[in-house]
Swiss-Prot record:
Keywords from the named record: Gluconeogenesis, Glycolysis, Isomerase
EC number in record: 5.4.2.11
GO biological process, one term: glycolytic process
The protein's name in its UniProt record: 2,3-bisphosphoglycerate-dependent phosphoglycerate mutase
Stored PANTHER family: PHOSPHOGLYCERATE MUTASE (PTHR11931)
Length: 230
């Protein structure tokens, strides 16, 4: 049986300052570094060994993966970075303070933008300082592919081709896989893996730095789910 471990990146600097982050590339906070290292220690304590690692193109997820693998003595395993595991793009909300945005638009509207499955936030302009329209890491993508705003539905549509072409084949081959990514890209994967409804997915929380372990049978059906903690 194969195992898949999902880790939301450790606390970021913008988690700490309560800003919408999305595709903006911010670093881990000091607490986030410790969360990532703790995840690695838990992985080692539970005897989890991996054949393949995946992460996004964003520093906070990449560093979380590296800290976790280093702590578990597995920094050497093959690693693939992909934009398809990036956080959900928050559109024009990127960079804004969440509390101030709620005061301006109302708590209910901001909650809908943040958690609704199919409602898009306002789109970001290309000249916005927090746009990725001219970010070099996406230069090989068709410009129309780089999002201006995403909801969870669009995020799932972005993530699924990578699941089908890379992650699922690894698991079907009996490999153990670790993914360090983001709250919403991992919520999208979790929705698919657990067949969670559009309504119920709104309430799913992904804690920073917490490893979630899935065990799959040969048909890629989940036979066990475990969250690692102290």
């Amino acid at each position: 049986m194969s195992k898949l471990v999902l880790i939301r990146h450790g606390q970021s600097e913008w988690n700490l300052s309560n800003q919408f982050t999305g595709w903006v590339d911010v670093n881990l906070s000091e607490k986030g570094v410790e969360e990532a290292k703790k995840a690695g220690r838990l992985i080692k304590e539970h005897g989890l060994e991996f054949d393949q690692a995946y992460t996004s193109l964003l520093t906070r997820a990449i560093k979380t993966l590296h800290y976790a693998l280093e702590e578990s003595d597995q920094l050497w395993i093959p690693e693939t970075k992909t934009w398809r595991l990036n956080e959900r793009h928050y559109g024009a909300l990127q960079g804004l303070n969440k509390k101030a945005t709620a005061e301006k638009y109302g708590d209910e509207q901001v909650h809908i933008w943040r958690r609704s499955y199919d409602v898009l936030p306002p789109a970001i302009d290309d000249d916005n300082e927090f746009s990725q329209a001219h970010d070099r890491r996406y230069a090989n993508l068709d410009p129309h592919i780089v999002p201006k705003a995403e909801n969870l539905h669009v995020t799932l549509d972005r993530v699924m081709p990578f699941w089908e072409d890379n992650i699922a084949p690894d698991l079907l081959d009996g490999k153990n896989v670790i993914i360090a990514a983001h709250g919403n890209s991992l919520r999208a994967l979790t929705k698919y893996i657990e067949n969670i409804s559009d309504d119920d997915i709104m309430d799913l929380e992904m804690k920073t730095g917490e490893p979630v372990v899935y065990t799959f049978d040969e048909n890629l059906d989940v036979v066990n789910k475990e969250k690692l903690d102290d």
